[in-house]
Amino acid sequence: MRSLTLSLVACSIAMAPLAAQQDRATFAVLPFQNEQSFGLPPETYVALESGLAQLLASELARSPAGQLADRGKTGEALGKRTVPPTRLDAASAQRIGALVGARYVVLGNFVDAYGKIRVNARIVDASSGRFLKAVSNDDPKLQSRDQLHRAVQSLARQILAELSLAAPTESPALPTPAVIAFSQGLAAEEAGDRAAAAKHFQAALDAAPGFADAKEAAARVR
Protein backbone atom coordinates (compact mmCIF):
# COMPACT_ATOMS: atom_id res chain seq x y z
CA MET A 1 0.00 0.00 0.00
CA ARG A 2 2.86 2.33 0.91
CA SER A 3 4.47 1.56 -2.45
CA LEU A 4 1.25 2.44 -4.28
CA THR A 5 0.92 5.70 -2.32
CA LEU A 6 4.50 6.71 -3.13
CA SER A 7 3.91 5.89 -6.79
CA LEU A 8 0.79 8.06 -6.88
CA VAL A 9 2.63 10.94 -5.20
CA ALA A 10 5.51 10.64 -7.66
CA CYS A 11 3.05 10.60 -10.55
CA SER A 12 1.29 13.70 -9.23
CA ILE A 13 4.59 15.54 -8.85
CA ALA A 14 5.64 14.59 -12.37
CA MET A 15 2.32 15.70 -13.84
CA ALA A 16 2.17 19.03 -12.00
CA PRO A 17 4.72 20.85 -14.19
CA LEU A 18 3.01 19.51 -17.31
CA ALA A 19 -0.39 20.73 -16.12
CA ALA A 20 1.05 24.14 -15.27
CA GLN A 21 2.67 24.33 -18.68
CA GLN A 22 -0.62 23.49 -20.40
CA ASP A 23 -2.34 26.30 -18.49
CA ARG A 24 0.12 28.91 -19.73
CA ALA A 25 -0.75 31.10 -22.72
CA THR A 26 1.42 30.30 -25.73
CA PHE A 27 2.70 33.23 -27.78
CA ALA A 28 4.17 33.40 -31.27
CA VAL A 29 5.91 36.70 -31.96
CA LEU A 30 6.45 37.34 -35.66
CA PRO A 31 9.31 39.45 -37.06
CA PHE A 32 8.71 43.17 -36.71
CA GLN A 33 8.38 45.34 -39.80
CA ASN A 34 10.63 48.33 -40.34
CA GLU A 35 8.55 51.32 -41.41
CA GLN A 36 11.08 53.43 -43.33
CA SER A 37 13.58 54.12 -40.55
CA PHE A 38 16.51 56.50 -40.90
CA GLY A 39 19.67 57.16 -38.92
CA LEU A 40 21.41 53.77 -39.01
CA PRO A 41 22.58 51.59 -41.93
CA PRO A 42 19.64 49.90 -43.69
CA GLU A 43 20.97 46.43 -42.88
CA THR A 44 20.82 47.27 -39.17
CA TYR A 45 17.09 47.92 -39.41
CA VAL A 46 16.62 44.66 -41.32
CA ALA A 47 18.40 42.86 -38.48
CA LEU A 48 16.26 44.58 -35.85
CA GLU A 49 13.13 43.08 -37.39
CA SER A 50 14.10 39.67 -35.99
CA GLY A 51 15.96 41.03 -32.98
CA LEU A 52 13.07 43.04 -31.56
CA ALA A 53 10.69 40.12 -32.08
CA GLN A 54 13.01 37.80 -30.17
CA LEU A 55 13.45 40.26 -27.32
CA LEU A 56 9.69 40.79 -27.02
CA ALA A 57 9.16 37.03 -27.04
CA SER A 58 11.68 36.61 -24.24
CA GLU A 59 9.95 39.29 -22.16
CA LEU A 60 6.56 37.59 -22.63
CA ALA A 61 8.09 34.28 -21.57
CA ARG A 62 9.19 35.88 -18.30
CA SER A 63 5.57 35.88 -17.22
CA PRO A 64 4.65 32.86 -15.09
CA ALA A 65 1.52 32.66 -17.26
CA GLY A 66 3.28 32.86 -20.63
CA GLN A 67 5.33 30.57 -22.83
CA LEU A 68 6.59 30.64 -26.41
CA ALA A 69 5.72 28.57 -29.43
CA ASP A 70 8.65 26.59 -30.77
CA ARG A 71 11.03 28.98 -32.55
CA GLY A 72 11.82 26.49 -35.30
CA LYS A 73 8.17 25.77 -36.02
CA THR A 74 7.41 29.49 -36.12
CA GLY A 75 10.18 29.98 -38.67
CA GLU A 76 8.82 27.13 -40.78
CA ALA A 77 5.30 28.57 -40.59
CA LEU A 78 6.58 31.96 -41.73
CA GLY A 79 8.22 30.25 -44.68
CA LYS A 80 4.85 28.82 -45.70
CA ARG A 81 3.02 32.15 -45.70
CA THR A 82 1.33 33.18 -48.92
CA VAL A 83 1.74 36.94 -48.45
CA PRO A 84 4.90 39.07 -48.25
CA PRO A 85 6.02 40.03 -44.73
CA THR A 86 4.83 43.61 -45.14
CA ARG A 87 1.28 42.33 -45.61
CA LEU A 88 0.99 40.04 -42.62
CA ASP A 89 -2.51 40.54 -41.28
CA ALA A 90 -4.84 38.94 -38.76
CA ALA A 91 -5.77 36.11 -41.13
CA SER A 92 -2.10 35.32 -41.77
CA ALA A 93 -1.42 35.46 -38.04
CA GLN A 94 -4.31 33.08 -37.39
CA ARG A 95 -2.94 30.54 -39.87
CA ILE A 96 0.54 30.76 -38.38
CA GLY A 97 -0.85 30.46 -34.87
CA ALA A 98 -2.69 27.28 -35.83
CA LEU A 99 0.47 25.78 -37.34
CA VAL A 100 2.60 26.42 -34.27
CA GLY A 101 -0.02 25.87 -31.56
CA ALA A 102 -0.05 29.46 -30.31
CA ARG A 103 -2.99 30.99 -28.48
CA TYR A 104 -1.85 34.53 -29.30
CA VAL A 105 0.18 35.87 -32.21
CA VAL A 106 1.94 39.21 -31.94
CA LEU A 107 2.61 41.41 -34.98
CA GLY A 108 4.93 44.38 -34.57
CA ASN A 109 6.52 47.28 -36.39
CA PHE A 110 8.92 50.08 -35.63
CA VAL A 111 10.19 53.34 -37.04
CA ASP A 112 13.39 55.17 -36.14
CA ALA A 113 13.52 58.84 -37.14
CA TYR A 114 17.18 59.63 -36.51
CA GLY A 115 17.07 58.37 -32.94
CA LYS A 116 13.41 58.89 -32.07
CA ILE A 117 11.88 55.43 -31.90
CA ARG A 118 8.30 54.28 -32.19
CA VAL A 119 7.61 50.60 -31.48
CA ASN A 120 4.15 49.09 -31.90
CA ALA A 121 2.63 45.64 -31.42
CA ARG A 122 -0.77 44.13 -32.13
CA ILE A 123 -2.20 41.07 -30.41
CA VAL A 124 -4.14 38.56 -32.49
CA ASP A 125 -6.35 35.85 -30.98
CA ALA A 126 -5.14 32.84 -32.96
CA SER A 127 -8.41 30.95 -32.51
CA SER A 128 -10.62 33.66 -34.01
CA GLY A 129 -8.18 35.77 -36.03
CA ARG A 130 -9.46 38.85 -34.22
CA PHE A 131 -7.22 41.78 -33.31
CA LEU A 132 -7.47 42.22 -29.56
CA LYS A 133 -5.33 45.26 -28.83
CA ALA A 134 -2.59 47.50 -30.18
CA VAL A 135 0.12 48.72 -27.81
CA SER A 136 2.95 51.20 -28.24
CA ASN A 137 5.76 52.99 -26.42
CA ASP A 138 3.61 56.05 -25.75
CA ASP A 139 5.75 57.25 -22.85
CA PRO A 140 8.05 59.99 -24.27
CA LYS A 141 10.83 58.68 -22.00
CA LEU A 142 10.79 55.43 -23.99
CA GLN A 143 10.97 57.00 -27.45
CA SER A 144 14.73 57.45 -27.67
CA ARG A 145 16.82 54.85 -29.49
CA ASP A 146 18.88 54.61 -26.30
CA GLN A 147 15.76 53.25 -24.57
CA LEU A 148 14.94 50.66 -27.23
CA HIS A 149 14.94 47.63 -24.93
CA ARG A 150 12.94 49.46 -22.27
CA ALA A 151 10.37 50.21 -24.97
CA VAL A 152 10.15 46.51 -25.82
CA GLN A 153 9.78 45.66 -22.13
CA SER A 154 6.93 48.15 -21.95
CA LEU A 155 5.16 46.44 -24.85
CA ALA A 156 5.41 43.09 -23.08
CA ARG A 157 3.94 44.47 -19.87
CA GLN A 158 1.07 46.08 -21.78
CA ILE A 159 0.32 42.90 -23.73
CA LEU A 160 0.25 40.76 -20.61
CA ALA A 161 -1.90 43.28 -18.75
CA GLU A 162 -4.37 43.43 -21.64
CA LEU A 163 -4.71 39.64 -21.52
CA SER A 164 -4.99 39.61 -17.71
CA LEU A 165 -1.79 37.57 -17.43
CA ALA A 166 0.87 37.93 -14.77
CA ALA A 167 3.52 40.58 -15.36
CA PRO A 168 6.99 39.43 -16.39
CA THR A 169 9.69 39.06 -13.79
CA GLU A 170 11.92 42.11 -13.58
CA SER A 171 15.06 42.13 -15.68
CA PRO A 172 17.63 44.86 -16.34
CA ALA A 173 17.27 46.79 -19.58
CA LEU A 174 19.87 46.03 -22.22
CA PRO A 175 21.99 48.76 -23.80
CA THR A 176 21.05 49.45 -27.39
CA PRO A 177 24.48 48.42 -28.77
CA ALA A 178 23.85 44.96 -27.29
CA VAL A 179 20.39 44.85 -28.87
CA ILE A 180 21.81 45.80 -32.27
CA ALA A 181 24.69 43.31 -32.07
CA PHE A 182 22.31 40.52 -31.05
CA SER A 183 19.98 41.40 -33.93
CA GLN A 184 22.90 41.36 -36.36
CA GLY A 185 23.85 37.95 -35.02
CA LEU A 186 20.36 36.61 -35.69
CA ALA A 187 20.48 38.01 -39.23
CA ALA A 188 23.84 36.33 -39.86
CA GLU A 189 22.58 33.07 -38.40
CA GLU A 190 19.48 33.18 -40.60
CA ALA A 191 21.78 33.75 -43.59
CA GLY A 192 23.82 30.68 -42.65
CA ASP A 193 26.98 32.59 -41.67
CA ARG A 194 27.72 31.02 -38.29
CA ALA A 195 31.13 32.67 -37.93
CA ALA A 196 29.68 36.16 -38.38
CA ALA A 197 26.79 35.27 -36.10
CA ALA A 198 29.18 34.15 -33.36
CA LYS A 199 31.11 37.41 -33.68
CA HIS A 200 27.97 39.52 -33.31
CA PHE A 201 26.64 37.48 -30.39
CA GLN A 202 29.97 37.90 -28.62
CA ALA A 203 29.78 41.65 -29.23
CA ALA A 204 26.33 41.61 -27.62
CA LEU A 205 27.75 39.79 -24.60
CA ASP A 206 30.66 42.22 -24.39
CA ALA A 207 28.12 45.05 -24.18
CA ALA A 208 25.83 43.16 -21.77
CA PRO A 209 27.51 40.16 -20.06
CA GLY A 210 24.23 38.98 -18.54
CA PHE A 211 22.35 38.92 -21.86
CA ALA A 212 20.72 35.47 -21.65
CA ASP A 213 19.41 35.37 -25.24
CA ALA A 214 22.86 36.22 -26.59
CA LYS A 215 24.47 33.49 -24.46
CA GLU A 216 22.01 30.93 -25.77
CA ALA A 217 22.50 32.10 -29.35
CA ALA A 218 26.30 32.07 -29.05
CA ALA A 219 26.20 28.47 -27.84
CA ARG A 220 23.86 27.58 -30.70
CA VAL A 221 26.28 28.71 -33.44
CA ARG A 222 29.50 27.30 -31.98
Regions found by a protein language model. Name each.
Residues 174-189, 216:
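Alpha-helical tetratricopeptide repeat
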Residues 75-77, 83-179:
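Catalytic-center loop of serine/cysteine hydrolases
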Residues 22-90, 105-112, 132:
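Short beta-strand->alpha-helix linker/helix-N-cap micro-motif
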